[in-house]
């Protein structure tokens, strides 16, 4: 059975880009007779906004969304992540990293998603002294291409050794890394389809590699075009995207429908009816592949 999900982070409030992802993932799930889960990705407490998680859920309800089952909070799933990391340790796929980020990045080259780790701690004899600090844990990556067929973008491939380097699964500050948590959650929740923004396209080969290492299924992926401001910057919390205004629900939903190339919906003041229209007329093939300017 199709199982999709929407996974916001409570580092801020929902904005127009969040709404586009929510509508697309919801419409794709419901149009395929599937479930739509909501997962709160609250992995990084220092970056979270107090009250954002509950505000996000209330906003989703105000815009007519209905999810299946209970909301999942990553902050309550550490035991799952510990078990997942243990499996990778047992398989000899991960190692402790004692490197200071500033030091290893000083001589590192840039890859697809930031600096490529130089592999210093791969070899026990080369690891610097810890000096009482706990290490991070990295996974060894293969020197081969990992690719997939995206439902919107098409073919996408990375060589993890060349483009990314061994990446962190558990941070030295004691927090779980996104890549491990999202793979563990998707597998445990039986997620079969992931519809999300193209800012996460670059993370997908890492997640597929982790799925292969853990022997869990790889979902089908579709990465949505990003919404950008007049300066070409992605609308986000960092670029001060305004929070969704529940008093403008119909207007904002219709705006997102236009971005997703949905036909114009009939007049109604009920958000749930607008979402039903989106589900009935959903066509992934019509979704644009490239960024959309959203004033």
Curated annotation (Swiss-Prot):
Binding-site residues for ATP, renumbered to this chain: 237
Gene Ontology cellular component terms for the protein in this record: cytosol
InterPro entries found in the cross-reference section: Glu-Q_tRNA(Asp)_Synthase, Glu/Gln-tRNA-synth, Glu/Gln-tRNA-synth_Ib_cat-dom, GluQ/Sye, Rossmann-like_a/b/a_fold
Cofactor(s) this protein cannot do without: Zn(2+)
Signal sequence, renumbered to the chain: none
Annotated motif 'HIGH' region, positions: 8-18
EC category name: ligase
Cofactor: how bound: Binds 1 zinc ion per subunit.
Cell cycle listed as a keyword: no
Function of the molecule: Catalyzes the tRNA-independent activation of glutamate in presence of ATP and the subsequent transfer of glutamate onto a tRNA(Asp). Glutamate is transferred on the 2-amino-5-(4,5-dihydroxy-2-cyclopenten-1-yl) moiety of the queuosine in the wobble position of the QUC anticodon.
Gene Ontology terms, MF aspect: ATP binding; glutamate-tRNA ligase activity; zinc ion binding
Positions that bind Zn(2+): 97, 99, 117, 121
Coiled-coil ranges from the UniProt annotation: none
Name this polypeptide is given: Glutamyl-Q tRNA(Asp) synthetase
Entry keywords, A to Z: Aminoacyl-tRNA synthetase, ATP-binding, Ligase, Metal-binding, Nucleotide-binding, Zinc
Example GO biological process: tRNA modification
Organism whose genome encodes this protein: Neisseria gonorrhoeae (strain NCCP11945)
Binding locations of L-glutamate: 5-9, 41, 178, 196
Pfam family, one: tRNA-synt_1c
Enzyme nomenclature, EC number: 6.1.1.-
Annotated family: Belongs to the class-I aminoacyl-tRNA synthetase family. GluQ subfamily.
'KMSKS' region (motif): residue ranges: 234-238
């Amino acid at each position: 059975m199709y199982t999709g999900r929407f996974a916001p982070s409570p580092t801020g409030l929902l904005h127009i880009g969040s709404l586009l992802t929510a509508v697309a993932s919801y419409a794709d799930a419901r149009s395929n007779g599937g479930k739509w889960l909501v997962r709160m990705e609250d992995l990084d407490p220092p970056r979270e906004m107090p009250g954002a998680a509950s505000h996000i859920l209330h906003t989703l309800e105000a815009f007519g969304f209905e999810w299946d089952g209970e909301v999942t909070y990553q902050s309550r799933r550490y035991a799952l992540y510990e078990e997942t990391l243990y499996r990778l340790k047992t398989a000899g796929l991960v190692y402790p990293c004692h490197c200071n980020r500033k030091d290893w990045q000083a001589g590192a080259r840039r890859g697809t998603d930031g600096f490529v780790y130089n592999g210093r701690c791969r070899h026990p004899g080369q690891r610097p002294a810890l000096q009482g600090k706990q290490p991070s844990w990295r996974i060894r990556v293969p020197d081969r291409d990992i690719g997939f067929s995206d439902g919107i973008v098409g073919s996408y491939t990375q060589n993890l050794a060349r483009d990314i380097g061994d990446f962190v699964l558990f941070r030295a500050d004691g927090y779980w890394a996104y890549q491990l948590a999202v793979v563990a959650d998707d597998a445990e929740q039986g997620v079969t389809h992931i519809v999300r923004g193209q800012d996460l396209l670059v993370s997908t080969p890492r997640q597929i590699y982790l799925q292969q290492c853990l022997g869990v299924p790889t979902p089908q992926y579709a990465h949505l075009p990003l919404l950008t401001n007049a300066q070409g910057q992605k609308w986000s919390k960092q670029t001060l995207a305004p929070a969704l205004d529940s008093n403008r629900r119909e207007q904002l939903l219709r705006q997102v429908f236009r971005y997703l190339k949905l036909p114009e919906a009939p007049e109604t003041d009920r958000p749930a009816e607008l979402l039903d229209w989106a589900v009935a007329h959903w066509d992934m093939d019509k979704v644009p592949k490239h960024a959309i300017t959203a004033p």
